[in-house]
Amino acid sequence: MILRIDDTDLERNTEQSLQSIFEGLEWLGLDWDEQYRQSERLALHRQMAESILAKGLAYRDFTPAGSADEAETGHSGGAWLSNPGQREISAEESDRRAVAGEPFVLRFRVPRTGEEIRFHDAVYGDQSKSTDDIEDFALLRSNGVPTYHLASCADDADLRISHVVRGQDHLTNTFKHILIFRAAGVEAPQFAHLPLLIAPDGSKLSKRKHGPVVSVTTYRDAGFLPQAFINFLCLLGWSPKDDREKMTREELVQVFSFEGINRSNAVINFTEENPFDAKALWLNAEHIRTMAAAELAEQLMPVVESAGFTITPEKMAQIIPLIQERIHLLRDVLTVGDFFFVTELPPYDSAELIPKKGDAALALRVLEKALETLATAEFTHDGLDAALRAAAENLGIKAGQMFEPIRVAVCGRKTAPPLFGTLEVLGRETCLARIERAISKLK
């Protein structure tokens, strides 16, 4: 696998942004055998440009550049195709002015013959465009730096790229690239253009406009699993032609085809309040639910430790069955199961200890009975189940009224994982200490 960084636009590329790209790819498990930066291959790009110029298939445009965009695209608006005055300068005069140091943009000399340039796109099908509708696009900017068109084609040829797979917004650029390949005497690769990922308002995703939500590392840091995020990305504009949604990396590789790609742009749904797409969260939760406990423990341990807690792998293995069905993101372990890791529970309202259809007096009776019961009960799931149900019967109350105050006392809230498993993992000493503190709050 080859990783090529298109960084010829030196003003817009920074080492920080490149590092973020590298980290994102590595997190997704996309490793590479060779790495190239286009900015380090300028000699190769210029060699192709000089070859095309020598064949008379390009010309120097000495018109003062109005802007970088104008130099890149060949026009600043309207239906500009070429500048006849520049296009028709003789080779001798062009060479003389270039040697004298006069700045120029090197442009491709698009033939004005009305020829139809055709290619088959693996996603969008047969495409064609007349050369009469293609402007004399730039190959080299006035500072000598190659444009995207030239650099991409030169590198594709040199690295023997078989398939160019890129965003749909480059579909029209392909006609220009075919002309470059033809002029260089190189066979064009196959092309496949993918639908774009767009924001809910229909705009193209942009870090400048939409912030960190467009960065892969944002999802990594939020607690997404790499395999789940790949699953989500693949389903944006592609489907396996059946009703499957949760798929492993191996399953995706096995069934993927260009034929399954939708031509419509794919929307990533996010808001300021909910920065992550609901489908992405659901898929992540599904992958978490089906992970082996040991594998999930490897993912959760760093999250817990980074929050300043110390926990053994054995203890984490006990916790996982209690929370695995309740977390959507890895970081949720700190909210769903925080009471497993803290030495002392955060403050909570003593009113939370009062069971339904009960009062503070009943809550106090329940907790005092629980303290007595748990001091001698067998501290296993089944042993705790039997002992606490017997205690409820002894008090003449429903089991739910017994369990509610205990759950709040040991977890600090009413919503928590299954009670008996939670008590077993916390252990006798911790449970008794927390119940004693709850009794003190009620008194």
Which sequence ranges carry the predicted segments?
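Active-site cores that bind ATP or allylic diphosphates and position pyrophosphate for catalysis
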Residues: 3, 60, 64-193, 198-207, ...
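Glycine- and acidic
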Residues: 3-7, 159-164, 214, 370, ...
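Catalytic adenosine-cofactor/nucleotide-binding cores of aminoacyl-tRNA synthetases and other
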Residues: 10, 186-347, 354, 411-443
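Generic alpha-helical structural context detector
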Residues: 23, 50, 182, 231-234, ...
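C-terminal accessory/binding modules appended to enzymatic or scaffolding proteins
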Residues: 297, 353-410
